């Protein structure tokens, strides 16, 4: 049954929103995996764990906003299976940050693709929603991860575990 409130909301936009919800949930799931990897007793980097847990919560909030938007526009929510993260072990902090950067770039590209669909279908509400709540935030997240990667690389944190520990404690605020 078609929604009585639906207006100028193309079915391609509706389908793309459902795919984006899944991608945000996948990102949240991946960050949850990272967070609990870094809080293991044999890894014990609480700053990394906290950083990735916060990212997980943020991605979940993004999915929730999309779910609400879908309902406000009269679309239908069609949830899909959430894919398991590519890995179970995340290695060192630098490696995990590099994986997180790629994940954020993938999410950003999906948002840009969604914006293009909205623009092509002349949906100013969806364009405004994405511009207001997502696009700039993605660029900021990518920049922050890039900065962390640069600093971990400069510190040679892969070979120097003390540098990784200090980054965890002082940059990410880890409490030992």
From Swiss-Prot:
Record keywords: Iron, Iron storage, Metal-binding, Oxidoreductase
Entry GO CC: cytoplasm
A Gene Ontology BP annotation from the UniProt entry: intracellular iron ion homeostasis
Binding site for Fe cation 2: 59, 104, 138
The protein's Enzyme Commission number: 1.16.3.1
Positions of the Ferritin-like diiron domain: 7-156
InterPro entries: Ferritin (IPR001519), Ferritin-like (IPR012347), Ferritin-like_diiron (IPR009040), Ferritin-like_SF (IPR009078), Ferritin_CS (IPR014034), Ferritin_DPS_dom (IPR008331)
Gene Ontology MF, one: ferrous iron binding
Binding site for Fe cation 1: 24, 59, 62
CDD domains: Euk_Ferritin (cd01056)
Signal peptide annotation: none
Catalytic activity line of the entry: 4 Fe(2+) + O2 + 4 H(+) = 4 Fe(3+) + 2 H2O
Tissue and organ expression note: Almost exclusively in the gonads.
Function summary: Stores iron in a soluble, non-toxic, readily available form. Important for iron homeostasis. Has ferroxidase activity. Iron is taken up in the ferrous form and deposited as ferric hydroxides after oxidation.
Protein family per UniProt: Belongs to the ferritin family.
Complex formation: Oligomer of 24 subunits. There are at least two types of subunits. The functional molecule forms a roughly spherical shell with a diameter of 12 nm and contains a central cavity into which the insoluble mineral iron core is deposited.
Protein name as it appears in the record: Ferritin, middle subunit
């Amino acid at each position: 049954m078609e929604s009585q409130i639906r207006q100028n909301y193309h079915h391609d936009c509706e389908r793309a929103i459902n795919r984006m919800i899944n991608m945000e949930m996948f990102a949240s799931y991946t960050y949850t995996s990272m967070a609990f990897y870094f809080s293991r007793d044999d890894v014990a980097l609480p700053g990394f764990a906290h950083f990735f847990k916060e990212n997980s919560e943020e991605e979940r909030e993004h999915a929730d906003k999309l779910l609400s938007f879908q309902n406000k526009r009269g679309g239908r929510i069609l949830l899909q299976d959430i894919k398991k993260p590519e890995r179970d072990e995340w290695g060192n902090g630098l490696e995990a940050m590099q994986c997180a950067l790629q994940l954020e770039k993938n999410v950003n590209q999906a948002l840009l693709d969604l914006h293009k669909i909205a623009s092509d279908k002349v949906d100013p509400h969806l364009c405004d929603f994405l511009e207001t709540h997502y696009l700039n935030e993605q660029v900021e997240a990518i920049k922050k991860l890039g900065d962390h990667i640069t600093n971990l690389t400069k510190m040679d944190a892969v070979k120097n575990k003390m540098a990784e520990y200090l980054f965890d404690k002082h940059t990410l605020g880890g409490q030992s």
